[in-house]
Amino acid sequence: MNATIEELLKSGQMLLNTGNPKGAMTVYDKILEISPNHIDALIKKGNILGKLGKYDNAIIYYDRVLGEESQNILALLNKGLAYHYIGQYQIALDCYEQVLMIKPRNVTALYNKASSLVKSKRIEEGLKVLSDVIEIDFSCKVKAKFDIDFTSIQKNNEFRKIVL
């Protein structure tokens, strides 16, 4: 008996939860054999590839999702993160801007935007966005204090005012 896509999704998630990303990847591949444009399987596969540091490959899967659903917020956020991690901050910022056009107060997009701005040496802009996102979600204040992306500005007086 063949497993249904729903059963396969549950199995893949269980494998991920128990620390078996390769097994989960195999399950998501099975789903994609059955349904090549299955959004959840494409996103999960992109996530696994991203966690394995294979950002270029992850982006391919997020692009496939966006080919089906151009306003898929999760795919846009994850694609932005993948570009951020490979140092292509402007493309990452473009992804976050697309999310913010759909959901202007999306905390993840705003926080990631601040991070990419700082990493691209646009410190003042990044600090403004960081300050704005902290107004929406105070937990971002604590997160920013310890975020590796902000280590280069730890001694910046404006950053210290925002996070301390």
Model-derived regions: residue spans:
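Helix-start (N-cap) detector for alpha-helical repeat units in TPR-like alpha-solenoids
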Residues: I5-E6, I39-D40, I73-L74, V107-T108, ...
